[in-house]
């Protein structure tokens, strides 16, 4: 172990240009203890050497160091060094040093009872400990002591410097990971008040001069402070984990070594194998000049028991140290367990000494970052105070972006108080001087405000005026005059002039001059007991201005209020106590009771049962520095405020229109929390209240409140007749700023209605006045002067019943606010009366209805009478326009359907509605199918008219030939979107397709135009008058017309008196005669008219969406005839889905889309093998009457004989998604087979069938097999909503059927048909069979049969794929059931359809 002199920096002692090698940071590790083997021997020798030289060192400080021969040599045990060059050089360098003798590691002697101090002096530095051996680890080595004494002031030799360098080399060469880090709980700072390796006596140490010390475990080595003057200046702050204090000495002027922050610290460790190795370190005092005091031996602390409490005590000692320099402080806290406990050093720019930041007076490292030049206490008289870096005085805030994203802006400071408190305290916020009146309590009466200008500004009743003393019955001065009357005449005269003061004698219950009763000595604890200790109270966090997540109990709040010390500032401002024991002990001021509108108009029977707004008594409990930001009391109510304890400071902003606008903008601003509203309005007044003061705050005044000290306040809110206009204005602001309902005045609207009823009840309008106003809209009731002048000499004395009678005095402020009250209640009456009012939801309408009390008559009639009452009382003015008879009734009213409440109904209501709708639709369909043909003809005949034939190839222009019923205006002119399924958000404006593509939607406008101007629905022929039955019947009639082929048979002129038409006339008539047909514009060749353009889909209702079918219901669950007429939307490509072979019998798979097909039923091909084309009217009759076999025989004969040439369907033109095209190819009709028989496919599923879900197309693959393809709404569909739809047209000439080979010569791209009706064309007089395209499916492979059963039996394979020559044969062979009796089939199909539609259905899957 080297002596302490090796660390002394001697100026000029080193060779010229000699540079001490600096080990890299993190490479220097603490010196390890030597082995235990020969520690005892070595310590004994050191003690002998020290005892022999101690006196000499003390007396001759300049003597030479002991020679190497004086130091007993011992070998290095346990240093298993590697053969590195650095180790070799270091060993050689150490060998040249006479004092750097290898230390033997010996355990402590049992006879040694000297202890080392655990708490070293503050001014003593520390010495570097011995180097730790590589191979051994012995905790007892930390107590080793040096035996060599040395002179403090003598300059060291060159060998000392070289020895230091060698030690550095050794430290550099030593590994840094020999031992794991030792917990800080075992770290100890020990005394090092000795400079040699012996335990010195107190007398020896007293005579020594203390200088700079270094900590090596618990030993200090003295350094010469005077030798530091030539060291280069260096003022750096560095992090140290304590190992720096072990690795390098604290030499004045040099930077402390902080490179070993990751090395294990020196600490006293327990030995598991020995229990007697507890080293009691003697507590040694600070060496100040030459005096050191030792602690008693019995005051030792075992090193093994030292832990965290010891460190805390050391920290406290260091914090409380009066020493200015850590060069003399050995309370070195060197935590190294983690970086959070690192100790920061700072250097003095004056003396260049290093200090721990705590010793320098800094709390943490963050404070040192602002230091420019640090000056220790010793240097301050010479160098001045510590300087800091320049910091801007501008206020900066750190934004909590997470909170800001949620709309909550929090204060960035660490202060517990609100961020406005400090500026207010420092008067940084300027306020205008206030001159609000201070009034005596006897002057504050209702009469004062009613007969004046009302209560327009805050009023303060000082505590010195509002006492509890009784008022004497007479004036003391008058009593003195009476007693001093010299004569009887004078006495009588005084009695005659006795002041007529009417004093009310009341029971003394502790009331003050305002007649307000509040228990004296009320405290927060008492409030807690009276209200209920376990009752909940809402607590406000002042800093965030938001309520706590959970309500506190009154017990918890009382404990918080009475607690002292730093705490989060919280406030209670919404504790209403009227229904508690405390509420029965309080009485409001008389002025408040007289002006309270609620007390005047609320029914007594409701008050008796406790059903009234409870806002009369609020107990406000605030700790110091509470702050409530600017607000207006709910409903524009007025406030009374009495300070029981503490102080309050108000900041008032008058309720001018510009200020209210600023207030509304401020409330909606995201920077509300950090924007002082007073700075925005430029008009803000400050009012300070003390204990006992009472304040009245008028309606609408914007105010904030600061609590300078703990306070207890009793207050309350009340509405008045004097502030109708302001109260209603504030209520509207609350609505605009979206104030939650729980923070609004309860039953505000109901109180206003009760006020109106009170006016009309106590002072009814005479009949003569009502008649005069009703007869003449310009009538004015003449008054000589306003009625608010009628007091005193002008008091009203007219008898009751007179037009000029007043039941009471009406103030000017009250009369001026009545028009605002009438307008406000008129709107509520219109809403309750189901009139159209903008921006009113169903929930709002229901709430308004509940807010209107029971009254004689309708609310609209009552408010109309009140309008006349206002004109009568105000006088000399006309009544409002809306009071005229019939004006209100002329406004639009909601329809019966629109009166239904919005929002998603409950599951139970949904089920009930679905069951009722399903039952009604079933009944309607069953009645329609069972009605005899005669009845239907009787019902429909009176309304039918012949339709004039149109010109050839010209589209129909009107539908005047069909009786048009009177439809709901909303249904015909306004698009009705389906319910979104939830009550959240506005209704969708765009269709789903455009909304998903995020483009502007024009489909709703087109749909509106089409439905409003061109769509006419014929329901008069149904014979049923119930809405559900009519809807169901209408849908069935339309679909029945589609099922019939949607064309006209040539020669069926006997039906309903219709003459035989040519092809174009039949086409036009087929559209016009369709019950739900759609008229087309002139020049529009598409049968769909406007519907041929791309359109999005409205969202289906819940029932249809769950059952996965196209929805034709409106938003109220009824069948929408317009939706029933719309064409279905394309779903998927022809290869999307293929039904399984065994599922071909699934009846509903063919009828999946009816939206567009029912709109234009004529644009549908009909297969000659199944049915003959006939008019939709005829088909409808045949469906309704069940007579399906009357006309097909006639048509078959016509087909056999041949018909005029007409346009036939080509294979590529069956898709409704294709534009209309005319085909010129002719087909010989003589080749048509004569086996075409009855129109079996004449029945369709109801509008809610599966026909609106999938499109089934029969296709022929390469092998000739027929494959049914199911189309679903897939985005991969070729004919998507983004592409124009193409629909076939009809030409007057007839396509003659050719051979199968000829049909293959017209290859066309396969196009899908969305529905059986959409891909089918009608040829008058011709039963056009389907043509087969050899290797490609025909374009008429759509769902050609509107009856699923018939389609699967007759069309799916045979008709659509067989050529004309093989048509009948293929139909016979594959579907022999096509000749089933149509009557039985129709009845069976209806039942089957209903089972599919309203029961559980099985969808066709993939093949």
UniProtKB/Swiss-Prot annotation:
It is an enzyme of class 1 (oxidoreductase). It catalyses: N(6),N(6)-dimethyl-L-lysyl(36)-[histone H3] + 2 2-oxoglutarate + 2 O2 = L-lysyl(36)-[histone H3] + 2 formaldehyde + 2 succinate + 2 CO2. Residues 55-67, 125-140, 896-914, 928-938, 1254-1264, 1285-1296 have a biased composition (Basic and acidic residues). Its cofactor is Fe(2+). Residues 1273-1284, 1297-1349 have a biased composition (Low complexity). Residues 1-86, 98-151, 893-987, 1004-1027, 1122-1183, 1252-1389 are annotated as: Disordered. Keywords: Chromatin regulator, Dioxygenase, Iron, Metal-binding, Nucleus, Oxidoreductase, Transcription, Transcription regulation, Zinc, Zinc-finger. Residues 141-150, 1008-1027 have a biased composition (Polar residues). The keyword NADP does not apply. One of its GO terms (molecular function) is transcription coregulator activity. A zinc finger (PHD-type) spans 323-382. Pfam families: JHD (PF17811), JmjC (PF02373), PHD (PF00628). InterPro entries: JHD (IPR041070), JHDM1_Histone_Demethylase (IPR050690), JmjC_dom (IPR003347), Zinc_finger_PHD-type_CS (IPR019786), Zn2Cys6_DnaBD (IPR001138), Znf_FYVE_PHD (IPR011011), Znf_PHD (IPR001965), Znf_PHD-finger (IPR019787). Its main location: nucleus. Binds 1 Fe(2+) ion per subunit. Fe cation binds at residues 631, 633, 703. It is found in: Nucleus. The JmjC domain mediates the demethylation activity. Belongs to the JHDM1 histone demethylase family. Histone demethylase that specifically demethylates 'Lys-36' of histone H3, thereby playing a central role in histone code. This is JmjC domain-containing histone demethylation protein 1. It comes from Emericella nidulans (strain FGSC A4 / ATCC 38163 / CBS 112.46 / NRRL 194 / M139) (Aspergillus nidulans). The gene is jhd1.
């Amino acid at each position: 172990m080297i002596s302490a002199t090796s660390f002394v920096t001697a100026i000029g002692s080193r060779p010229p240009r000699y540079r001490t090698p600096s080990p890299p940071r993190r490479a220097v590790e603490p010196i390890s203890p030597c082995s235990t083997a020969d520690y005892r021997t070595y310590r004994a020798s050191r003690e002998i050497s020290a005892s022999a030289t101690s006196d000499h060192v003390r007396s001759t400080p300049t003597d030479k160091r002991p020679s190497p021969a004086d130091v007993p040599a011992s070998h290095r045990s346990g240093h298993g060094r590697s053969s590195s060059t650095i180790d070799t050089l270091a060993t050689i360098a150490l060998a040249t040093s006479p004092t750097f003798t290898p230390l033997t590691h010996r355990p402590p002697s049992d006879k040694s009872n000297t202890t080392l101090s655990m708490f070293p002096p503050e001014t003593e530095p520390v010495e570097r400990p011995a180097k730790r051996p590589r191979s051994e680890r012995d905790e007892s080595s930390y107590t080793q002591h040096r035996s060599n004494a040395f002179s403090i002031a003598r300059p060291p030799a060159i060998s000392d410097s070289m020895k230091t360098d060698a030690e550095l080399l050794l430290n550099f060469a030593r590994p840094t990971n020999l031992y794991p880090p030792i917990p800080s709980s075992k770290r100890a700072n020990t005394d090092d008040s000795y400079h040699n390796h012996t335990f010195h006596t107190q007398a020896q140490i007293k005579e020594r001069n203390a200088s700079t010390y270094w900590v090596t475990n618990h030993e200090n080595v003295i350094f010469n402070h005077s030798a530091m003057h030539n060291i280069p200046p260096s003022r750096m702050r560095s992090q140290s984990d304590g190992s720096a204090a072990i690795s390098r000495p604290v030499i004045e002027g040099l930077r402390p070594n902080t490179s070993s922050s990751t090395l294990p610290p020196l600490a006293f460790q327990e030995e598991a194998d020995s229990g007697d190795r507890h080293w009691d370190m003697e507590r040694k005092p600070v060496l100040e000049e030459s005096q050191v005091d030792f602690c008693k031996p019995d005051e030792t602390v075992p090193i093994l028991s030292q832990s965290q409490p010891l460190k805390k005590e050391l920290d406290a000692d260091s914090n409380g140290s009066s020493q200015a320099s850590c060069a003399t402080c050995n309370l070195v806290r060197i935590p190294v367990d983690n970086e959070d406990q690192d100790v920061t050093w700072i250097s003095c720019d004056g003396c260049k000494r290093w200090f721990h930041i705590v010793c320098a007076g800094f709390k943490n490292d963050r404070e040192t970052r602002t230091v420019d030049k640090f000056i220790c206490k010793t240097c301050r008289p010479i160098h001045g105070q510590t300087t800091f870096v320049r910091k801007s005085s501008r206020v900066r805030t750190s934004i909590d972006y997470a909170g800001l994203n949620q709309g909550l802006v929090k204060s960035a400071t660490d202060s517990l108080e609100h961020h406005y408190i400090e500026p207010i305290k420092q008067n940084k916020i300027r306020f205008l001087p206030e001159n609000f009146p201070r009034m005596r309590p006897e002057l504050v009466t209702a009469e004062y405000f009613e007969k004046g200008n009302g209560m327009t500004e805050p009023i303060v009743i000082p505590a010195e005026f509002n006492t509890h003393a009784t008022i004497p019955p007479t004036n003391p001065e008058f009593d003195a005059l009476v007693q001093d009357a010299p004569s009887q005449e004078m006495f009588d005269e005084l009695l005659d002039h006795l002041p007529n003061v009417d004093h009310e004698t009341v029971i003394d219950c502790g009331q003050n001059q305002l007649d307000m009763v509040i228990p004296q000595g009320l405290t927060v604890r008492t409030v807690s007991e009276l209200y209920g200790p376990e009752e909940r109270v809402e607590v406000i966090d002042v800093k965030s201005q938001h309520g706590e997540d959970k309500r506190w109990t009154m017990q918890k709040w009382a404990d918080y209020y009475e607690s002292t010390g730093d705490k989060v500032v919280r406030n209670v401002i919404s504790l209403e106590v009227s229904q508690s024991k405390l509420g029965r002990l309080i009485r409001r001021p008389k002025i408040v009771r007289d002006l309270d509108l609620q007390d005047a108009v609320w029914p007594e029977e409701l008050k008796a049962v406790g059903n009234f707004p409870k806002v009369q008594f609020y107990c406000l409990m605030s700790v110091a520095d509470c702050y409530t930001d600017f607000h207006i009391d709910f409903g524009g109510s007025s406030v009374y405020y009495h300070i029981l304890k503490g102080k309050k400071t108000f900041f008032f902003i008058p309720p001018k229109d510009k200020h209210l606008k600023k207030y509304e903008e401020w409330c909606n601003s995201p920077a509300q929390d950090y924007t002082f509203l007073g700075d925005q309005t430029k008009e803000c007044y400050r009012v300070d209240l003390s204990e006992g003061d009472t304040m009245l705050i008028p309606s609408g005044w914007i105010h904030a409140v600061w609590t300078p000290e703990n306070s207890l306040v009793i207050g309350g809110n009340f509405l008045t007749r004097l502030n109708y206009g302001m109260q209603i204005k504030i209520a509207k602001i609350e609505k605009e700023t979206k104030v939650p309902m729980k923070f609004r005045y309860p039953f505000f609207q109901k109180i206003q209605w009760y006020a109106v009823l009170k006016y009309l009840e106590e002072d009814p309008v005479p009949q003569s006045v009502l008649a005069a106003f009703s007869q003449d809209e310009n009538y004015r009731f003449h008054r000589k002067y306003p009625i608010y002048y009628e007091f005193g000499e002008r008091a009203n004395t007219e008898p009751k019943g007179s037009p000029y009678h007043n039941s009471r005095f009406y103030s000017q402020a009250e009369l001026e606010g009545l028009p605002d009250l009438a307008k406000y209640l008129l709107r509520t009456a219109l809403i309750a009366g189901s009139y159209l009012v903008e921006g009113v939801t169903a929930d709002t309408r229901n709430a308004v209805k509940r807010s209107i009390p029971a009254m004689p008559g309708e609310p609209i009639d009552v408010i109309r009478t009140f309008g006349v009452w206002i004109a009568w009382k105000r006088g000399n003015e006309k009544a409002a326009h809306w009071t005229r008879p019939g004006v209100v009734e002329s406004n639009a009213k909601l329809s019966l359907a629109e009166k239904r409440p919005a929002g998603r109904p409950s599951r139970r209501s949904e089920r009930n509605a679905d069951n009722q709708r399903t039952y009604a639709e079933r009944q309607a369909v069953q009645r329609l199918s069972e009605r005899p043909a005669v009845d239907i003809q009787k019902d429909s005949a009176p309304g039918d008219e012949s339709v004039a034939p149109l010109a050839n190839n010209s589209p129909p222009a009107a539908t005047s030939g069909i009786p048009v019923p009177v439809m709901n205006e909303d249904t015909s002119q306004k698009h009705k979107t389906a319910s979104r399924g939830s009550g959240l958000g506005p209704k969708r404006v765009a269709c789903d397709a455009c909304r998903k593509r995020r483009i502007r939607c024009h489909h709703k406008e087109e749909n509106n135009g089409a439905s409003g101007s061109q769509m006419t629905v014929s329901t008069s022929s149904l014979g049923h008058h119930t809405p559900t039955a009519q809807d169901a019947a209408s849908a069935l009639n339309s679909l029945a017309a589609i099922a019939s082929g949607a064309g006209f048979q040539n020669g069926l002129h006997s039906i309903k008196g219709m003459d035989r038409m040519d092809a174009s006339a039949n086409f036009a008539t087929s559209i016009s005669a369709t019950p739900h047909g759609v008229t087309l514009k002139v020049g529009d060749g598409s049968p769909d008219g406007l519907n041929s353009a791309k359109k999005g889909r409205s969202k289906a209702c819940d029932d249809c969406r769950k059952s996965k079918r196209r929805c034709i219901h409106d938003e109220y669950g009824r069948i929408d005839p317009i939706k029933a007429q719309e064409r279905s939307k394309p779903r998927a490509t022809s290869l999307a889905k293929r039904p399984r072979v065994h599922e071909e019998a699934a009846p509903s798979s063919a009828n999946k889309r009816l939206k567009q097909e029912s709109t234009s039923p004529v644009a549908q091909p009909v297969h000659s093998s199944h049915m003959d084309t006939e008019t939709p009217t005829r088909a409808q009759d045949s469906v309704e009457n069940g007579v399906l076999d009357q006309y097909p025989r006639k048509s078959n004969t016509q087909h056999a004989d041949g018909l005029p040439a007409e346009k036939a369907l080509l294979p590529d033109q069956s898709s409704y998604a294709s534009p209309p095209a005319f085909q010129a190819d002719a087909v010989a009709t003589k080749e048509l087979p004569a086996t075409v028989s009855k129109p079996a496919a004449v029945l369709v599923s109801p509008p809610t069938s599966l026909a609106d879900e999938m499109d089934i197309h029969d296709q022929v693959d390469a092998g000739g097999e027929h494959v049914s393809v199911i189309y679903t709404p897939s985005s991969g569909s070729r004919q998507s909503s983004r592409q124009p739809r193409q629909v076939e047209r009809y030409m007057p000439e007839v396509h003659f059927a050719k051979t199968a080979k000829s049909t293959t010569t017209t290859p066309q791209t396969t196009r899908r048909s969305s529905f059986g009706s959409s891909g089918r064309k009608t040829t008058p007089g011709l039963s056009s069979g389907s043509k087969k395209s050899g290797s490609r499916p025909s374009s008429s492979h759509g769902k050609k049969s509107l009856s699923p059963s018939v389609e699967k039996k007759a069309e799916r394979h045979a008709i659509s794929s067989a050529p004309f020559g093989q048509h009948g044969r293929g139909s016979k062979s594959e579907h022999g059931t096509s000749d089933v009796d149509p009557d039985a089939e129709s009845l069976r199909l209806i039942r089957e359809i209903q089972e599919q539609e309203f029961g559980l259905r099985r969808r066709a899957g993939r093949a």
